UniProtKB/Swiss-Prot annotation:
Involved in protection against replication-dependent DNA damage. May act by restoring active replication forks, repairing unusual DNA structures, and/or preventing aberrant DNA rearrangement at arrested replication forks. InterPro entries: Mms22. GO terms for cellular component: Cul8-RING ubiquitin ligase complex; nucleus. The lineage of its organism: Eukaryota, Fungi, Dikarya, Ascomycota, Taphrinomycotina. The keyword Nucleus applies. Signal peptide: none annotated. Disulfide bonds: none annotated. This is Protein mms22. The gene is mus7. Belongs to the MMS22 family. It is found in: Nucleus.
């Protein structure tokens, strides 16, 4: 392959730093001895020879070979004394000076005839190395690396000065083998200190640009004069040399020779020295700082910072005049001025190195165009971020712009002083390890001079090296104290960052010479004809930018920060070497590259105002459009995350990024950041193509040529003028152009472009219009000579604009010869040769210029010129000319192909990348049309290059070279091919498809090894899984190479299908890409991951071909099916075949034919049948344990396969929005009937998947409707039906309904055959078989019942069956299933499915639905009732019992939790609606009320039966059970309250269960409901015997329950709730009915029980007395209004006397009964004596009070008689107060109880009730009497005054023996507050 730099990202050599190699440089022999410079005698001769050398130099020949520094003498005696060292040094210096002079004279007289003169870079390689370094640093705004000079004599001389002694440490110098310099040297002057600022990390990228060529003889002369160093210090040349050497004097080079500004310049230089800070001051300040702190910094090797030794700058120590004179005399030079003195360093010792000479050469050399990262290491305490921005000095001259002055470090030298050294407080760096550190950090070698020095210093003892980096202990003394103060102030300001910039002098004149491309070019005059080339003055448009830029940089500097402050030491970095990848290093280099390019571009505008005469010309910096930080970051992200950005340096076209590290880790760009143009972009309006100039040339039409008259170079050119004069004028203009070509600007280049365009019209006019073929031929010959000279000039001057001009000349040469040969109809070989040469030139120069043209074209800026798109236009011209000449659309590609050397068998990755880079970058060229406008990509394919590269890549992979990297590269190749076909629309893809197919076929269709993962299973690509819709063929990050290849196939065939003529091509491609063998994977053979992958990829390839190819070209389904032979095949192979069937059937069902659909279902049935047979065969095989385990494992695997099969069926069913009529084919015997019929053999998970498939299928059929198709009516106008407009609409409706009916009938028949009977069989088996597995079975039953409901709906709508067939007693009826708890719990679910899928069911069977609804409501704690209720409400059922339900939210917002909260309220509302409906029906007619009563009782029976079933089945200890009991009690209470009119315990047997306390717990609210019922009897007429008997029965029932269950308290509470005033406040009204009830209970019932006399009656009486006592006591807790008290007293007065009689009657016989009567009477006392002060009581109340007081007085008298021992009065013997209900009472008492002597026994329950003992009864009796007496005594003691006094007197009389008083008397005394009487006290003091 041609040895050229094709890619912008390919470097010439792998080395870096300052080592460059070139072709011609290697042929020149190196001289044995080196000369110090070129003498004036040989100057002119060297110049001429150098021109000859430059003419022979090809592109890139100026890369010099930089030699290393002279070796340091290793034989150093460190033990010499200072005196001996000084003497030896002087002797060696004298000897070296003599030898040097002799060699110089010999060089002047010797004439070299055999060899041409050595070039400067060959003569002085070190100087030239530093020259490049200095120029490059100045270009980017940095101070070059240098060391101070000026003290070349022995240090001991200064000791003789009259000044104060200065403590100077003698430094040993390494000697140089060269003789001393004879030329004069100027001192290196430092610029003022300026501000340093950190910048963003993203901008710290280094530019690795290469050196520039010596383009002109003047430049060579300037270099020679620079190296020679003339002695004329006051001459113009010396001043200019001074300007060149000093970085701050660049603006003084244009001073006129006639000017007398030499003295002014010298004064200016003197003034500038004031305030300059030498680096030695930094050392002093640092020392002072550490001493002030008093803290010793501990240095660490791992955290060392390169701390170069601080040396002095131009602010030197003041010397005595005698010392100065002696110094100058020893040096042999004249010292004319302290600033401009010329000194020649004299070496003192062979063992010392002359650092002054060596480092002084750095200040003069400014030709190094490469900034080396290593040089920055010499800057002490300077971080890399501080180098990002440069500042300028403040100057009154707006044109003055200075660069930053960096701190300087010296090269460490030996020190032999014997003084005691202080401990080094500074960080230490090992210089010998610096090159390795640079290599590790930046991936490039250090400069050779640093490597040589490191190698030499490695032999110096370590202690000496460390001492060299310590403080020099320099102390400076000054003649004046003011100087000391100034220096101290400068130090303080410098270190604190407050040091102001130095104002420089502006006594010189502004540059007046014109600015040119090189930056320092004077006006050029032609020799014959004066062609005015407009030279731009200094007042350029860039001036404003300079002023703004200088203002921005006038900032204060910041504190110094070390360059390695954020780095680690060499030792630590060596440890990190293993973790840092090459990619990380390349990223660092890339960042530095961006930084350097930005700085060079920024400073290039500054240097346009500097004019040099006789100096090196700085190469032209390309001014590109600055990208914003956002775009730079985006570009970096794309590079780091997706592609590698390959770019050419915008500042130097010779620079190429080295991407070998990227390739070593497998990173390549896919697109090279080249994308298609959008249509409509156009070249500049004045371009040759846009103006139809090229089109007129190709058509040989001079009339349409746009450049028949142009104005260029201040001359007018017109084809109407005399052609011969025009020809002479053109020749003169060309000559002028050649003379001034290096100094061209864009404007002159545009004039040249127009001139060459006119030349094309001139040739066409001369040849075609005038027939002057010889004249055209002569012009071509002249132009060829001009083109050759332009090529030579461009080889010397490597500026970008000159290269563009060279390309412009060569492009128009192709145009000229094309029109000449087309006009003469000659052979076109000359055009082909010229085009080939131009292509070679364009490709050899790199593609960065073309890419820049692409960017300019996309921007479409208004200021875009033809120069900005020149390379693109050149390529486009070549394309159109070659296409016109050869009539081939790929003619340009053939020329490019011939440029490559592709004859060898194998290509390296670098060579392949070169080809790819060219292909990608040339693709947009074909989008430019003859009109200069871009069009859509296409018609630019050329596959031979791609095939050659791909074959090499495949061969490399086959050979196994670096497999990982090669596989990554293969992926990049596939991505690029996909990109070419998809985006660039390359055609004729058959060959590349066949090549890739052969590659994968050889690999058995396996993925690459890097793409195979054992953890990640393979699967079909995503676009294959969705063939029913247009696939996404864009490449994703997860796509493998094979998937990318499949997408390429799909794109290619899809485009071929767009043209009908490509059918044969498609057939050929499809037949060629099909695998030619079937795969047999038996069950016995192992199945590896590669087999799985191979089989999957084979199916995928055939599926893609089937989908992409037309119907007559695609492979058949049987062909795809036969890839795997199903019988006896491996299960995994069947699974792959099944998945392939699934993905393929998605397309076949939608787009395939009926025959293909049948083939597909046959394929599926065969797989399913074999799997079923294998599964069922496992049940009968195997008897041993191992065989059984193997059978279980096989079953599990087969079950998984069946599940996958049914999943595949489910995936084939589309959404309901898509109507597909052929979906019915999925329901077959194998897919449904067989598994439902044998469901007991298969596990539930397999059966469930089958049911889910059926459910999805049935739901799709029920929810999908065929699309509406309007049928145009064919009714004739003569028919009478034509007058009706709705006939057509009716016909359409009928046709649509008929189509729906036919579709449903077809589905119903299929379901009837394969599904419905087997579904019912499975449901019946699961529901009625095993109730223990309810939860296990419910998972299957729910989808089964849903499918059954849908089947029933289809059968009813198809009129095959009626609803009764499924809900009554048909063969598939729900009622025929065994009535199990599981069935009852699922009834509502089944009916919910029926209602959901068919609205007609709820309309025809509303009563059945409501019955089921009440059953669901009975399960109060289950969720299905809520779902069923929500469903009924959603169906908007218009039943009156569902009106006004307590639901406060919308129906669609009802949730289960919300329904549970309103469940009971909803039942209450339903019961109210029933009561209202029944009441309305009863008023209307008896018949309707009877119907409603029977219907409502049926509903309530269903409700209560469900409640009873739930109560009996649930547990009796859980919280759920307790909640259910509470809810059930609430429901029963609501039924009793609201539905008592038509439902009771007689006609509603289920109600008895819940009212029986022995069977169901009664609620606490039962007393309230019972009290309400008791009150209801009061509302009735109690005079009626029926009502009275009902009341007797009700009370007796409650009394019996209380006696049997020991619930006497509940009965008392019942009576109190029914007849008391517990809820009545003071404003309550008198309830007459309740008062009558109380009277009836006391007078008729209680007195009857008391008069009956039996034991049973006595128990009833006790319960009734207790209840009545609580009832009347309840009146004591509220405030009674007077009239209510009056009425109560009237009520009591009726029966109080009778009660007293019975109390007296049973006083002896049954004292318990008497005591209870007295308790009742005590309650009367509280009522009668309350509120007596509110007014005068009535006579009734007074009588009542007196009657009650009499009872208490009698009791007191009885007590007195008891104490005195008197006899009691005779009691009442008989009481006759029986009522008319005595017989009824007797019957009630004897109905359930029979009496014994002391107890009673219940007849049925055998419950025995025993009376308390006699003593207890007596106590109860006395307690009752005492309660009556105490109540009266509390309310009014006046009623008991006489009797109470007597009683107390009797007690007092009984004082002698108080202990003998009865207990009841003591208790009474205690209650009335006289308990003290019974205590042992002195009764003499007691007064009554």
């Amino acid at each position: 392959m041609n040895s050229f730099l094709l890619l912008d990202h390919v470097s010439d050599s792998q080395d870096s730093g300052s080592e460059w190699s070139n072709t011609h440089g290697s042929l020149i022999s190196q001289r044995g001895n080196e000369y110090d410079g070129i003498t004036p005698a040989t100057k002119e001769k060297n110049q001429n020879k150098l021109e000859i050398l430059n003419n022979e130099t090809t592109i890139g020949s100026t890369k010099s070979s930089v030699s290393s520094l002279p070796e340091l003498n290793r034989n150093v005696s460190f033990e010499k004394s200072d005196q001996n060292l000084a003497e030896t040094k002087r002797e060696e210096e004298n000897k070296r000076t003599e030898v040097f002079k002799k060699d110089a004279e010999h060089e002047a007289v010797v004439v070299k005839r055999d060899f041409r003169p050595r070039r400067p870079e060959q003569t002085r390689p070190y100087t030239y190395d530093f020259l490049r370094h200095q120029i490059e640093f100045k270009r980017i705004g940095l101070v070059p690396i240098t060391v101070p000079h000026g003290f070349s004599s022995d240090r001991s001389i200064t000791s003789k000065s009259s000044h104060k002694p200065v403590n100077v440490i003698v430094r040993n110098r390494a000697s140089s083998r060269k003789p001393p310099l004879t030329s004069t040297h100027r001192f290196r002057r430092y610029g003022a200190v300026i501000s340093d600022s950190d910048d963003d990390e993203s901008n710290t990228e280094q530019d690795h640009s290469k050196e520039s060529n010596l383009n002109t003889a003047d430049n060579d002369l300037a270099l020679s004069s620079t190296i020679e160093g003339k002695k004329t210090s006051t001459s113009k040349e010396a001043l200019e040399s001074e300007s060149l050497l000093s970085d701050s004097d660049q603006s003084m080079t244009n001073i006129s020779s006639n000017s007398t500004v030499s003295d002014l310049n010298l004064k200016t230089l003197k003034k500038r020295l004031r305030g300059v800070l030498p680096p030695s001051f930094l050392t002093l300040q640092e020392k002072k700082k550490l001493e002030n702190r008093g803290v010793k910094k501990k240095t660490s090797l791992h955290k060392s910072v390169i701390e170069g030794e601080k040396i002095k700058g131009v602010a030197r120590r003041k010397l005595h005049p005698r010392s100065t004179a002696k110094l100058s005399s020893e040096l042999g030079n004249e010292i004319s001025d302290s600033d401009n003195s010329i000194s020649t360093p004299t070496p003192t010792d062979d063992s010392r190195f002359d650092t002054s000479e060596f480092l002084d050469s750095i200040s003069r050399d400014n030709g190094w165009l490469k900034e080396d990262v290593v040089d920055q290491l010499w800057l002490p305490k300077r971080s890399l971020s501080a180098l990002k921005k440069s500042s300028s000095l403040t100057s009154e001259n707006p044109f003055q712009l200075n660069v930053a002055a960096n701190a300087v470090s010296t090269i460490p030298v030996y020190r032999t002083t014997k003084t005691k050294m202080k401990k080094n407080r500074f960080k230490y760096v090992e210089v010998e390890k610096l090159p390795d550190l640079i290599l590790e950090s930046y991936g490039k070698k250090a400069p050779k001079f640093l490597r040589v020095f490191a190698r030499s210093s490695s032999h110096i003892p370590k202690m000496i090296r460390r001492k060299r980096q310590m403080d020099s202990k320099k102390y400076f003394s000054f003649d004046k104290e003011s100087d000391r103060q100034v220096i101290d102030q400068v130090l303080s300001d410098w270190y604190s960052g407050k040091h102001e910039l130095v104002q420089q002098s502006h006594s010189y004149k502004k540059p007046s010479d014109s600015k040119s491309v090189g930056g320092n070019i004077f006006s050029v005059n032609s020799k014959k004809h004066s062609v005015n080339i407009n030279a731009k003055t200094a007042a350029n448009n860039g001036l404003s930018h300079l002023q703004n830029f200088s203002e921005e940089l006038l900032k204060k500097r910041k504190l110094f920060s070390s360059l390695f402050s954020n780095n680690v030491s060499y030792k630590k970095s060596k440890k990190l070497k293993r973790t840092h990848t090459v990619h990380d290093k390349c990223q660092k280099v890339a960042k530095l590259d961006h930084y350097i390019r930005d700085n060079i571009e920024l400073n290039s505008k500054e240097r346009e105002h500097d004019c040099y005469e006789g100096t090196l010309a700085v190469p032209q910096v390309n001014t590109e459009i600055r990208k914003s930080s956002r775009k730079q970051k985006a570009q970096r992200f794309i590079r780091d995350d997706f592609d590698t950005v390959f770019f050419q340096s915008s500042s130097n076209p010779n620079y190429f990024t080295d991407v070998n590290p990227f390739w070593n880790i497998g990173i390549w760009s896919t697109t090279f950041n080249v994308i298609t143009f959008r249509p409509g972009l156009s070249l500049p309006n004045n371009s040759f193509i846009k103006t139809q100039g090229l089109n007129s040339i190709l058509q040989l039409d001079i009339v349409t040529h746009p450049f028949k008259s142009v104005y260029a170079f201040s001359c007018l050119f017109n084809i109407q003028d005399d052609v011969f004069k025009t020809f002479e004028k053109l020749k003169d203009t060309f000559e002028t152009v050649l003379e001034n070509l290096p100094y061209f600007t864009n404007s002159e280049t545009v004039d040249l472009y127009n001139l060459l365009s006119f030349c094309s019209a001139f040739i066409l006019h001369s040849q075609v219009s005038m027939g002057l073929v010889n004249l055209a031929s002569s012009f071509l010959e002249t132009y060829a000579l001009v083109n050759d000279r332009v090529s030579s000039i461009s080889g010397l001057n490597r500026s970008q604009l000159v290269e563009k001009i060279a390309v412009l000349f060569q492009t128009f040469q192709v145009v000229f010869y094309c029109e000449f040969e087309l006009g003469n109809q000659q052979n076109i070989n000359k055009v082909s040769w010229l085009a080939s040469d131009l292509i070679s030139k364009l490709l050899s120069a790199g593609q960065s210029g073309l890419l820049e043209c692409y960017r300019n074209l996309r921007i479409q800026a208004s200021d875009t010129t033809v120069i900005d798109t020149l390379f693109l236009e050149s390529w486009s011209i070549l394309n159109h000319i070659l296409f016109h000449v050869y009539k081939k659309k790929y003619a340009l590609w053939e020329q490019v192909n011939s440029f490559f050397d592709l004859q060898k068998k194998e290509l390296s990755i670098l060579e392949m990348e070169k080809i790819w880079y060219v292909i990608m970058t040339l693709n947009p060229v074909f989008q430019i049309g003859l009109n200069g406008t871009t069009h859509s990509p296409g018609n630019n394919s050329f596959w031979p290059l791609i095939i050659r590269v791909s074959e090499s890549a495949f061969k490399m992979h086959k050979d196994g070279h670096n497999v990982k990297v090669v596989e990554r590269y293969l992926r990049t190749v596939f991505l690029r091919i996909h990109f070419l076909i998809s985006e660039w629309r390359w055609e004729d893809v058959a060959q590349i498809l066949f090549l890739i197919f052969d590659f994968f076929s050889h690999r058995k269709f396996n993925d690459l090894s890097s793409e195979i993962s054992e953890d990640t299973p393979t699967d079909f690509p995503d676009f294959v899984k969705s063939l029913d819709r247009p696939p996404n063929l864009h490449v994703t990050a997860l796509d493998t190479c094979f998937v990318i290849y499949l997408k390429v196939i799909l794109i290619s065939i899809s485009r071929l299908r767009q043209v009908d003529e490509n059918t044969n091509s498609i057939k050929r491609i499809v037949s060629r890409l099909q695998p030619l063998h079937s795969r047999q994977y038996t069950r016995e053979s192992p199945f590896s991951i590669k087999d799985f992958m191979s089989l999957e990829h084979t199916h995928t390839l055939l599926i893609c071909l089937y989908w992409a190819a037309p119907e007559n070209c695609r492979p058949s389904l049987n062909r795809i099916r036969d890839i795997v032979i199903v019988d006896n095949s491996h299960l995994k192979a069947r699974l792959i075949s099944l998945k392939a069937w699934l993905h393929l059937m998605k397309y076949v069902i939608k787009e395939g034919t009926d025959y293909e659909l049948a083939q597909g279902m046959e394929w599926f049935n065969s797989i399913l049948k074999v799997t079923f047979d294998e599964y069922l065969a496992l049940f009968s095989n195997g008897t041993s344990v191992g065989e059984m385990q193997l059978a279980e494992y096989s079953k599990h695997q087969l079950e998984n396969a069946l599940i996958v099969a049914f999943h595949s069926l489910q995936d084939l069913i589309p959404n309901s929005s898509v109507y597909i009529s052929r979906i019915n084919v999925l329901v077959t015997e194998q897919s449904c009937r067989r598994i439902l019929k044998d469901s007991h053999f298969f596990p539930p998970r397999v059966t469930l998947e089958c049911i889910l498939f059926l459910k999805k299928f049935l739901q799709y059929q029920s929810n999908t409707e065929p699309p509406k198709v309007t049928v145009v009516g064919s009714t004739s106008h003569d028919s009478q039906d034509a007058y009706f407009d709705s006939d057509v609409l009716d016909d359409n409706t009928l046709i649509l309904e008929q189509e729906k009916f036919e579709r449903k009938y077809e589905v119903a028949q299929i379901l009837r055959t394969f599904v419905s009977p087997f579904l019912y069989q499975t449901i019946s088996y699961l529901v009625g078989n095993d109730e223990d597995k309810e939860n296990y079975i419910r998972i299957l039953l729910l989808p089964l019942m849903e499918c059954m409901a849908i089947c029933a709906s289809f059968a009813v709508e198809a009129k095959i069956n009626d609803w009764s067939y499924y809900i009554d007693f048909g063969s598939e009826s729900w009622e025929r299933i065994r009535n199990t708890p599981l069935k009852r719990s699922l009834s509502t679910t089944f009916y919910s499915f029926l209602i959901s899928y068919n609205d007609s069911f709820i309309k025809k069977h509303e009563e059945k639905v409501l019955t089921v609804w009440f059953e669901s409501l009975g399960a109060l704690d289950e969720d299905h009732a809520a779902q069923f209720t929500i469903l009924l409400l959603q169906k908007n059922l218009k039943n009156p019992i569902l009106l006004n339900l307590p639901i406060s939210v919308k129906i669609e917002e009802i949730s289960i939790n919300y329904f549970k909260s309103v469940h009971l309220n909803l039942l209450t509302a339903v019961f109210c609606n029933m009561a209202k409906l029944y009441a309305d029906a009863k008023t209307n007619g008896f018949a309707s009320s009877q119907y409603l009563q029977s219907l409502f009782i049926h509903y309530l029976s269903s409700l209560l039966s469900s409640m009873q079933h739930s109560y009996e089945t649930n547990g009796h200890s859980s919280d759920t059970h307790s909640l259910f009991v509470i809810n059930s009690q609430r429901v029963v209470g609501d039924i009793l309250q609201y539905c008592s009119q038509f439902a009771n315990d007689r006609n509603l047997p289920a109600l008895r269960y819940f009212m029986d306390s022995t069977k169901f717990p009664q609620p606490p609210e039962r007393l309230e409901y019972t009290a309400l019922r008791l009150r209801s009897y009061a509302r009735k007429t109690l005079t009626n015997s029926a009502s009275q008997n009902a009341l007797f029965s009700f009370l007796k029932a409650n009394f019996d329950v209380a006696l049997l269950e020991q619930k006497q308290t509940e009965t008392s509470n019942l009576l109190r709730l029914a007849m008391g005033f517990h809820n009545q406040n003071s404003s309550s009204k008198w309830d007459v009915e309740i008062s009558s009830l109380r009277k009836f209970c006391v007078k008729e019932l209680l007195l009857s029980y008391l008069g009956e006399g039996s034991l049973a009656a006595m128990f009833y009486s006790l319960l009734l007395l207790e209840g009545l006592s609580r009832t009347y006591n309840s009146f004591r807790r509220i405030y009674l209004q007077p009239y209510i008290q009056q009425l109560l007293c009237e009520e009591i007065s009726v029966f109080v006397a009778d009660l007293e009689k019975y109390a007296l009657l049973y006083e002896n016989k049954r004292p318990l009964l008497s005591g209870r009567i007295y308790y009742l009477i005590s309650s009367f006392v509280a009522i009668s004596m309350t509120n007596k002060t509110s007014g005068l009581p009535s006579s009734l109340i007074c009588n009542l009070q007196n009657f009650l007081a009499r009872i208490a007085r009698d009791f007191l008298l009885e007590l007195c008689w008891n104490i005195e021992g008197s006899e009691f009065p005779p009691p009442y013997n008989t009481v006759d107060c029986r009522s008319k209900f005595v017989k009824t009472i007797q019957q009630h008492c004897s109905a359930d109880w029979y009496d014994n002597v002391t107890n009673i026994v219940h007849k049925s329950r055998k419950k025995k009730l025993v009376l308390p003992s006699q003593v207890e009864q007596e106590e109860e009796y006395w307690s009752g009497l005492m309660e009556v007496t105490i109540q009266i005594w509390k309310h009014d003691k006046g009623f008991l005054e006489p009797e109470l006094d007597r009683f107390l007197n009797v007690i007092c009389s009984y004082a002698p023996d108080m202990s003998g008083l009865p207990t009841k008397i003591k208790c009474f005394l205690d209650k009335i507050g006289y308990s003290w009487m019974t205590e042992e006290n002195d009764f003499d003091i007691v007064l009554f």
